[in-house]
């Protein structure tokens, strides 16, 4: 079942005294978090009643049945998932969800296996891939651009790396 779920956000803290929570959102449009229906965390489902965007990837949400700060406190650090079939269908083969990239192979242009995508970050200026390099057993971070990663194959689960000279 875990493969069928996509993480949409994480509850970071309670907000106020009436049970609202702050949620860090991992979707392109944070205000749409309530449109996916029930969100799953562990064995529980949550319905988002209302959402107010307070930052680029941060919202204040009210959750059905959570009516006090104490109840909201129990939700701190809970990841919120949605079933993959609830996501919007992608129109183009060059479109994909970031969650699809995690654990994908990184191959060099000669098809040699270089490493695996460990995580994806965005610090404000674009997506950064954290790559676990097989040969050095270390992690590196590279900007996720078309120049550095010219080809993404979702079906076969690999990305081609055009190795920047400074990495060698």
Curated annotation (Swiss-Prot):
Pfam families: PRC_RimM, RimM. The keyword Signal does not apply. Signal peptide: none annotated. Residues 93-167 form the PRC barrel domain. InterPro entries: PRC_barrel-like_sf, PRC_RimM, RimM, RimM_N, RimM_N_sf, Transl_B-barrel_sf. GO terms for molecular function: ribosome binding. GO terms for biological process: ribosomal small subunit biogenesis; rRNA processing. It comes from the Bacteria. It is found in: Cytoplasm. Keywords: Chaperone, Cytoplasm, Ribosome biogenesis, rRNA processing. GO terms for cellular component: cytoplasm; ribosome. Binds ribosomal protein uS19. The PRC barrel domain binds ribosomal protein uS19. Belongs to the RimM family. An accessory protein needed during the final step in the assembly of 30S ribosomal subunit, possibly for assembly of the head region. Essential for efficient processing of 16S rRNA. May be needed both before and after RbfA during the maturation of 16S rRNA. It has affinity for free ribosomal 30S subunits but not for 70S ribosomes. This is Ribosome maturation factor RimM. It comes from Wolbachia sp. subsp. Brugia malayi (strain TRS). The lineage of its organism: Bacteria, Pseudomonadati, Pseudomonadota, Alphaproteobacteria, Rickettsiales.
